[in-house]
Amino acid sequence: MKPGVSVVITSCNRIELLKRTIESFNTMNTYPIAEFIIIDDSGNREAHQRIIELYPDYTCIFNSSNIGLIDSIDRAYSMVKTKYVFHIEDDWEFIKSGFIEPSLKIIENNPMVMQVWVSNIHNQPLDIEPLIADGVHYRYASLDGMDHLWHGFTFHPTIRSMRVYRVAAPWSQWSTSEDFLALRECKIGQEYFMRGFRAAVLPDSYCIHTGDQDTTWNIGQK
């Protein structure tokens, strides 16, 4: 039996970007998904109702007020019932198929992988040493950037085990609302790094970023 995978999508009143993300994911994904969970942090009931209408078969969580990205993730992950979760923000477009299968091979063969990136569009530095898991080639995200503060943790599209998530859960405990997003990634990544975890990166990029400029997340969260 294949390992169970749920998809968690964080969104904040960007319906068109969300639609593009989900459509491209469903077009390019080749792995059975147990459940889709969308968490809407807009505080806008009309926007949330629109999401429900678009995706009646998905689990749609509504935050009545804006609680921020990290708290939204913790809330959504509390509802995940599967062993693994594929994490997506609402502003990505998948352009290549077959990304979950190789990611799972890495995680299942290396228990110290905190997440597997399915995109490296910013060409973040990677370790020189190539690794292989059940025929899948990958590398670790390098530790030589950002003055050794960042350890490869990202909110970009990734797959992780719920076991690893719980090691440092809830993520909201490691930063404050005043922290900008990159610093929050650094702080959470530091917790995993101190426990011996690393981020794995597939050799190909399976998706591209479509958002950034059209966001309603506040600066401390997005």
Q: Where is each model-derived feature located?
A:
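Glycine-rich, basic loop-to-helix element that forms the pyrophosphate-binding segment
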Residues: N63-M79
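A conserved acidic beta->alpha catalytic loop
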Residues: I38-H48
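Conserved donor-nucleotide/metal-binding helix-loop-beta segment in metal-dependent transferases, i.e.
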Residues: S97-Q115
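N-proximal low-complexity "stem/linker" segments adjacent to membrane-targeting elements
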Residues: M1-E23
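C-terminal catalytic/acceptor-binding lobe
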Residues: R20, W150-K222
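Short beta-strand-to-loop element that shapes/binds the nucleotide-sugar donor at the catalytic cleft/hinge
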Residues: V116-P130
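Short aromatic/hydrophobic "clamp" motif used to bind/position activated sugar donors
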Residues: V85
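Short, acidic, metal-binding catalytic loop of nucleotide-sugar glycosyltransferases
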Residues: E23-I33
